[in-house]
Amino acid sequence: MGKITTWNDARIQALNPGVALPAAKITTVNRSDGSGTTFVFTNYLSQVSSDWKSKVGADKTVKWPNASASVGGKGNEGVSSNVQRVANSIGYVEYAYAKQNRLAYTQLQNRAGKFVLPDDSTFAAASNINWAQYPGFAVTITNMPAANAWPISAA
């Protein structure tokens, strides 16, 4: 919501002890088109931030906060291209695209308080639910309670 604006913010530094972070402004890169990736990402943000939920919400397209510090990109290609082009930026793409294109990604702290990387095992942990409770073909499995769950998952 624009509360952390530089990479060396004390809250980021506390999560990265011993890492020299630049005193540079953060530019966020988001999807400029509607996408399921945006829905899953904003659904997660809505679950972990009541501020995000009340002001932005979860959808395939949203009005991104702090627009002056963000750049839009069409599709995974546009987002990844802008992240690579714009210094000190961060964005989101689907895991398969990141893996196929050898993009860097981060660990996230999940609901259980554990820092995990996105991979097959953390996706499996997130999807380890009672599927009988979810009629239909899709379920949002963001921020699941499993100890090793990747927090931004969908099935």
Regions picked out by a protein language model, each given a short descriptive name:
Residues 1-155:
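Flexible loop/hinge segments at secondary-structure junctions
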